[in-house]
């Protein structure tokens, strides 16, 4: 009887062992088809926008309730932009064209804690509309690169009637244009072909970078974003700093880091649309990039100049850099770009990922 009992114990133990082995094999199979993709880059480079696009393209998008939660963010973006403009007007001694707009600017200074279930507050509608039409405000906006004015103001203020409609539900494009500063780590999971992608976005401002270290283990692919339009823009956290110089410095440390010796390095020079638009009125040689010798308004040569500049900072001749010019708010362009990224990852890691 004792032996029989022991036999049952042994059988149960063997069964548990088989289950454990089965679970381990299942986990190994799952992990072999999982791509850990880390999004890095300086602040304002468009990382959060890329993450939203992945949700739109590959993960069923945003529900109506999720979209409504972005209304307070959009309102806060508009308010914050006008406050930055007001400070800049004082700094650059720019006057409002219409003196009556003084009271409208005062209204934009009033704090308002908006809930997700309420429409944008009406008392800010006329002030926003009138200020947007003021030539003094427009003059300050022209200097937006000098005081870190976010690039979504033109988009939102050209459509204020729609935003202040009582039944307004933010569109996908509204969500892509809206700006919510990333703190900590945000993860998005989506399936693409035979692979499952786990994409991590970490805060880009200097104070957030110390948190990146926790994401570095077993990264298959590093996606580094640069706002190519930031060549003439100051940093949010340092008005004397330059976004492009900050990105070059950060890229050099990342591209040559021991953490990424086995990772694929993908470089997105993002906001190429804004870059092309501003280049004729803001030549890159005016902003410290004096080793550029191409035509001042040739966006093809100027964008290649920056891509070459980033590639040259990679000190490992055997490590390939996969470079793309992107516009993170353009869903179709990003879909094509991510298709190229997918092909590269499959080709590069075929044995580890599929076999």
UniProtKB/Swiss-Prot annotation:
GTP binds at residues 44-49, 151, 176, 182, 204, 270-271, 273, 328. GO terms for biological process: G protein-coupled receptor signaling pathway; negative regulation of pheromone response MAPK cascade; positive regulation of conjugation with cellular fusion. Guanine nucleotide-binding proteins (G proteins) are involved as modulators or transducers in various transmembrane signaling systems. This is Guanine nucleotide-binding protein alpha-2 subunit. Residues 33-355 form the G-alpha domain. Disulfide bonds: none annotated. Mg(2+) binds at residues 48, 182. Residues 1-20 are annotated as: Disordered. Belongs to the G-alpha family. G(q) subfamily. Its cofactor is Mg(2+). G proteins are composed of 3 units; alpha, beta and gamma. The alpha chain contains the guanine nucleotide binding site. Residues 326-331 are annotated as: G5 motif. PANTHER family: GTP-BINDING PROTEIN ALPHA SUBUNIT, GUANINE NUCLEOTIDE-BINDING PROTEIN ALPHA-1 SUBUNIT. Residues 197-206 are annotated as: G3 motif. It comes from the Eukaryota. Residues 36-49 are annotated as: G1 motif. Pfam families: G-alpha. Residues 266-273 are annotated as: G4 motif. GO terms for cellular component: cortical dynamic polarity patch; cytoplasm; heterotrimeric G-protein complex. Residues 174-182 are annotated as: G2 motif. Keywords: GTP-binding, Hydrolase, Magnesium, Metal-binding, Nucleotide-binding, Transducer. InterPro entries: Fungi_Gprotein_alpha (IPR002975), Gprotein_alpha_su (IPR001019), GproteinA_insert (IPR011025), P-loop_NTPase (IPR027417). GO terms for molecular function: G protein-coupled receptor binding; G-protein beta/gamma-subunit complex binding; GTP binding; GTPase activity; metal ion binding.
